[in-house]
A protein has these predicted regions:
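Flexible, glycine/small-residue-enriched loop-and-beta-strand segment within the central core
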Residues: 51-137, 171-172
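Short linear elements at protein peripheries
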Residues: 2, 17, 21-67
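Short beta-to-alpha loop/turn elements within the nucleotide-binding domains of ABC transporters
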Residues: 62, 136, 147-148, 154, ...
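Conserved catalytic segment of ABC-fold P-loop ATPases
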Residues: 139-142, 155-157
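A generic "structured core" feature
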Residues: 84, 133, 143-149
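Terminal amphipathic alpha-helical/low-complexity segments used for targeting or macromolecular assembly
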Residues: 1-36, 86, 93, 99-105, ...
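Conserved active-site beta-strand element of glycosyltransferases/polysaccharide synthases
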Residues: 160
Length: 192
């Protein structure tokens, strides 16, 4: 087993925990796994009670709202992603925030990046293996079916899927607003 700074910090962070030695070992393993795989720049804004389960990469200037759960999100490009409150991001979600300029002075594309940030509203659910293309905006309460390729704007409460993602249904707005007013939010997940 290789050791590194993540092993040291995993031991330091778990040494004083009032749990059994076996439980401490399990926690250390999870910490080591997450230390190795996380790339979150110092100027990313992370709200309260945000949970990451596995590897994620977030670009500088990105933000995550309170009580959001992320299993595995990879933000690529030089743009940012803004994720609202109480949203859930499933595994292997790719968000591409910039693209090469194919109308530039070189072919097949120029060195210039065209940056288009991505926005995900509050109370959204992004399914596994979804790809969010530059400039995507997902409205409050929308659901994106797993495996979708999303470009453009998805309206609030829409349920969409496919390649390219198309809206095929809407959530019940009355029920959604009632649950929201009552504060009935999905508790930030524990994926074990």
């Amino acid at each position: 087993m290789t050791t590194g700074p993540h092993d040291f910090w995993a031991k330091v962070l778990t040494f004083w925990l009032p749990v059994s030695k076996e439980r401490r070992r399990t926690i250390r393993h999870r910490l080591r796994s997450n230390f190795v795989r996380m790339t979150i720049h110092k100027d990313v804004q992370i709200g309260e009670d945000v949970r990451f389960h596995e590897k994620s990469h977030l670009t500088p200037g990105s933000s995550i709202g309170d009580h959001t759960g992320i299993i595995n999100l990879d933000v690529q490009g030089v743009g940012t992603i803004k994720i609202g409150r109480y949203s859930m991001i499933s595994w292997d979600v790719l968000a591409v925030t910039s693209n090469h300029d194919f109308n530039g002075e070189n072919i097949p594309f120029d060195h210039e990046n065209i940056v288009k940030d991505i926005e995900i509203g509050d109370f959204c659910w992004i399914g596994a293996r979804t790809m969010l293309l530059p400039g995507t905006k997902i409205g409050e309460g929308a659901i994106v079916q797993g495996g979708s390729v999303v470009h453009g704007t998805i309206p609030p409460l829409a349920i969409c899927g496919g390649n390219p993602a198309k809206v095929f249904a809407y959530r019940d707005a009355e029920k959604f607003n009632r649950l929201k007013a009552e504060g009935k939010f999905f508790d930030t997940f524990d994926v074990n």
